[in-house]
Structures are given as structure tokens and as C-alpha cells.
Amino acid sequence: MGSADERRFEVLRAIVADFVATQEPIGSKSLVERHNLGVSSATVRNDMAVLEAEGYITQPHTSSGRVPTEKGYREFVDRLEDVKPLSSAERRAIQSFLESGVDLDDVLRRAVRLLAQLTRQVAVVQYPTLSTSTVRHLEVIALTPARLLMVVITDSGRVDQRIVELGDVIDDHQLAQLREILGQALEGKKLSAASVAVADLASQLGGAGGLGDAVGRAATVLLESLVEHTEERLLLGGTANLTRNAADFGGSLRSILEALEEQVVVLRLLAAQQEAGKVTVRIGHETASEQMVGTSMVSTAYGTAHTVYGGMGVVGPTRMDYPGTIASVAAVALYIGDVLGAR
């Protein structure tokens, strides 16, 4: 790229930075005063004219200044060289806050609250998707000789408890056998494979009497746990931050709030996050949703080195501190994965 193009990008970068900070359209005079661009105000005016002709900035009808367009923000994000690093104190605080979570629900609630505070945007965290979860442990506890409590724990920390009513009583030896049979069928398997395994057990042993009947009944109940609750869930935090930026959305704030409440659009965008550590920025129409026009979404996946648990990120106006937001989303995702993976 030639020097004139590089200079114009520096002008664009300055316009984005100032507009994000001030919410006011930016003129050439203020750019020269605030930034060491090394050229005259006349040159900056010419560069702004070129940027406007190429669709990177535009002039609000009520102002003599310019503001970035979606195309301008995209160019700015694509050419980001430095993402604002979090301080070591901030990183330690994030890690400590998340590690204090008592279970999966608490960790994710803490994460969404923390991300909303860090970015001053709406934070969204998807519950771990069942399709990628692995059964870490199955516990079977006798409440009575004919009534069992089964607890399924996944690698992401998801816990599901089910009661099994047996047709007959079983003794401690049979309980140990039942626990071993079910554990071998489930533990270490992806939930999709585990559901097939218990379905086979249920069909083979259901109604066989004694231990076989107990295994069949338990497998049938487990199948409900593994298969029936596949709906995706989303946690939201900081929704009030949208109203703080209401002027950025024009008249579309209501439709944005409705999209967040319905969750379908956000879950679709988060479902595309398949790689932990990679942050995706969607600006304006890139969300492919009319309800989300005027917003940007910065998102990533969280999980371990080998397993993606779900997606997370923030939704806010296109007038967003992209370097700071990208850093915050990446950091919180990293620590969620570490905390859940260590449990």
C-alpha cells in the first residue's frame, strides 16, 4: 500500500478513536490538534474527502464533521495491530473472581457480569453445548432399596440429577454392579455416544427382572437426561448498557432488545464460534439480522485445548472500543475455560 493510503488509514484510525471517545462527529481541525499526523489540515481534509468517497466515513446531515461507517469500522478492525492488553492485576482479579464460583452456573453468571462491567456492553455467554460435552462421572446412590438417585457430571461441569423408581429392591452388591455397568457405558463418552449406549442397555435389559430390570429402568431415565434437555441456554448481563448508548441505535433499540430476549439470533452467531482463542468481530449488517442493525458483536469460544464448550461475547453499538473489547472477551473466555477444565 502506498504512503498516501497509509496516511489515509492513520486519518481513519484517528477518526474512529475520537468518535468512540466523544460521540461527536470529527472535523479535520480537531484531528490535527489531537493527533500527530505530520501533515497540514488541508491535507487531512483532502484525505477525509477520499475516505468519504470510498465509503469509510460519512457526514451526518446535522454536522460538518465526519463519522465512521460500517466499512470504516471493518477496515479499522481488520488492521488492528495492537489489542489493549489487560494489566496483570486485572488478569489476577478476573481469575480469582471466576475461580470463586461454586459450580458451572455460578461461574457463568460471574463471567457474564464481569464481562459486562469490563466492556460496558451487553455480555452474552452460552451454556456448554450438550453435543460437545463428555460424561466425566456417573454416581448412583440408593435412597431406598427400590429408589435410586443418579447424578451425571459432564466435563464442562454440567450436573443433572434423576430419580429412578425400581420395580423391585436391590442389595448393595447389585447396586455396585449397576454402578459399574452404567459407568462403563457412559463415562468418557460424548453425550451423543453415551445416549446410544444407554439406549442399547435399556432395550436389552428392560423388563428382564432383578439387576437387568434395574439397569433397564436406570438406562431409560438416563436417556431422558442425555437427550431431552438439548435446548441451548444463554446468559445475558448488562442489558442496561444498551440504554446508555441509546442514541447510537436511533429507533432500533427496541428491536435489539427483542432479539436479545428471543436469543435465537445471538445463539446462531455464537454457534459459529468453533475455535477457542479466536475472536470474531461482526459489525452492523455482518450479523445478518435486521433486528441487530446498528450493533456490533465481538465473540469467541471458551473451553479447553481439546473441547469447545460454548460461545461468549458482547453486543454493543458499532461505535465501540474494539481493541479494549477484544482483549476483555479473549481474557474472560480464557479464564472460563481454565476454571471449568480444572474441575
Curated annotation (Swiss-Prot):
<keyword id="KW-0804">Transcription</keyword>
<protein>
    <recommendedName>
        <fullName>Heat-inducible transcription repressor HrcA</fullName>
    </recommendedName>
</protein>
<keyword id="KW-0678">Repressor</keyword>
<dbReference type="Pfam" id="PF01628">
    <property type="entry name" value="HrcA"/>
</dbReference>
<dbReference type="InterPro" id="IPR023120">
    <property type="entry name" value="WHTH_transcript_rep_HrcA_IDD"/>
</dbReference>
<keyword id="KW-0346">Stress response</keyword>
<comment type="function">
    <text>Negative regulator of class I heat shock genes (grpE-dnaK-dnaJ and groELS operons). Prevents heat-shock induction of these operons.</text>
</comment>
<dbReference type="InterPro" id="IPR036390">
    <property type="entry name" value="WH_DNA-bd_sf"/>
</dbReference>
<dbReference type="GO" id="GO:0045892">
    <property type="term" value="P:negative regulation of DNA-templated transcription"/>
</dbReference>
<dbReference type="InterPro" id="IPR021153">
    <property type="entry name" value="HrcA_C"/>
</dbReference>
<dbReference type="InterPro" id="IPR036388">
    <property type="entry name" value="WH-like_DNA-bd_sf"/>
</dbReference>
<dbReference type="GO" id="GO:0003677">
    <property type="term" value="F:DNA binding"/>
</dbReference>
<dbReference type="InterPro" id="IPR002571">
    <property type="entry name" value="HrcA"/>
</dbReference>
<comment type="similarity">
    <text>Belongs to the HrcA family.</text>
</comment>
<dbReference type="InterPro" id="IPR029016">
    <property type="entry name" value="GAF-like_dom_sf"/>
</dbReference>
<keyword id="KW-0805">Transcription regulation</keyword>
<dbReference type="GO" id="GO:0005886">
    <property type="term" value="C:plasma membrane"/>
</dbReference>
